[in-house]
C-alpha cells in the first residue's frame, strides 16, 4: 500500500488556476496534490544576443523555491550568490520541454520567460512546473494573438510531465515526497499530447532497474501524461 493510499496508477489531485497574476501576460497556479507551483509568463520584445537576426524567437525558464516550500527553511539562492546545479538543471529542462512544442519562427523575434516558483514542495516540483508552464505559455501566446501580435498561436501541441518510480518493488505513478524519498527507482517523463517523448530522467537509488521495469514506468507515465493533457485542455477552455 502506498503511503498516500492511492492506487499504483493513480495521480494526486491536479488543478490549474489561470490568470492569478495581474501584470504577467500569462500565469498559472498549478497544484499536484500538496505541491504548488506559481508560473508567470513574461513577453519581451528582445532576444539573447546570440539569437538576433535569425528570424525566430525563444522560450526559456527560471525556477526557484520559496524558503519555506520545504519542511525546513531553505536559504534563498540569492544569498549564496549562485544557483545550485539542481536549479540550473530543472530550469533548462522546463525551457527545453516548452520549446519542443513551440513554433519559434511563428513567435517572431521575441522572448518569453516562464518564471516557476515553488510555493510548497511535496515531490514532483519539476513535473508540476512543466505542466503548469505550458498553460501559462498558452495564455501568454493567446494574449499576443488577441492583440494582433501573432497571426496564429504558435503552439504545436501540449506538453506535460509526470514522475514515476518503483516503491517497495512496485511501479507507481506520481510520487509524493514520502514515496520519492524511499523509492528504489525514480524517473521523470516529459511527453507531448500525441505521445512523443521529450525527455526521460531515471535513476536507480538502490539497485539497478530492469528493462521490463522501465517499460512499466513508461506505460504509467503515458497514462499520467494523457490525463494531464486532458486537464490542460479543460483548463484553457474555462
UniProtKB/Swiss-Prot annotation:
InterPro entries: ExoRNase_PH_dom1, ExoRNase_PH_dom2, ExoRNase_PH_dom2_sf, PNPase/RNase_PH_dom_sf, Ribosomal_Su5_D2-typ_SF, RNase_PH, RNase_PH_bac-type, RNase_PH_CS. It comes from Azorhizobium caulinodans (strain ATCC 43989 / DSM 5975 / JCM 20966 / LMG 6465 / NBRC 14845 / NCIMB 13405 / ORS 571). SUPFAM superfamilies: Ribonuclease PH domain 2-like, Ribosomal protein S5 domain 2-like. The gene is rph. Belongs to the RNase PH family. It catalyses: tRNA(n+1) + phosphate = tRNA(n) + a ribonucleoside 5'-diphosphate. The lineage of its organism: Bacteria, Pseudomonadati, Pseudomonadota, Alphaproteobacteria, Hyphomicrobiales. One of its GO terms (biological process) is tRNA processing. Its EC number is 2.7.7.56. This is Ribonuclease PH. Phosphorolytic 3'-5' exoribonuclease that plays an important role in tRNA 3'-end maturation. Removes nucleotide residues following the 3'-CCA terminus of tRNAs; can also add nucleotides to the ends of RNA molecules by using nucleoside diphosphates as substrates, but this may not be physiologically important. Probably plays a role in initiation of 16S rRNA degradation (leading to ribosome degradation) during starvation.
Amino acid at each position: 500500500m502506498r503511503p498516500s493510499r492511492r492506487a499504483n496508477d493513480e495521480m494526486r489531485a491536479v488543478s490549474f488556476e489561470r490568470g492569478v497574476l495581474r501584470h504577467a501576460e500569462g500565469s498559472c497556479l498549478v497544484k499536484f496534490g500538496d505541491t504548488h507551483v506559481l508560473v508567470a509568463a513574461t513577453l519581451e520584445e528582445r532576444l539573447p544576443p546570440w539569437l538576433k537576426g535569425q528570424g525566430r524567437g525563444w522560450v526559456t525558464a527560471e525556477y526557484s523555491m520559496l524558503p519555506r516550500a520545504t519542511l525546513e527553511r531553505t536559504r534563498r539562492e540569492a544569498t549564496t550568490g549562485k544557483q545550485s546545479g539542481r536549479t540550473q538543471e530543472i530550469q533548462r529542462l522546463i525551457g527545453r520541454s516548452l520549446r519542443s512544442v513551440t513554433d519559434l519562427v511563428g513567435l517572431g523575434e521575441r522572448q518569453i520567460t516562464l518564471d516557476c516558483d515553488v510555493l510548497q514542495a511535496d515531490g514532483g516540483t519539476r513535473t508540476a512546473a512543466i505542466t503548469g508552464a505550458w498553460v501559462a505559455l498558452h495564455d501568454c501566446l493567446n494574449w499576443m494573438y488577441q492583440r494582433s501580435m501573432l497571426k496564429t498561436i504558435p503552439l504545436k501541441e501540449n506538453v506535460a510531465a509526470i514522475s514515476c518510480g518503483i516503491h517497495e518493488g512496485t511501479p507507481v505513478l506520481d510520487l509524493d515526497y514520502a514515496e520519492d524519498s524511499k523509492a528504489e527507482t525514480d524517473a521523470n517523463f516529459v511527453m507531448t499530447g500525441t505521445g512523443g517523448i521529450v525527455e526521460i530522467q531515471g535513476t536507480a537509488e538502490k539497485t539497478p532497474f530492469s528493462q521490463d521495469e522501465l517499460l512499466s514506468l513508461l506505460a504509467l507515465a503515458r497514462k499520467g501524461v494523457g490525463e494531464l493533457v486532458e486537464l490542460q485542455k479543460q483548463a484553457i477552455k474555462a
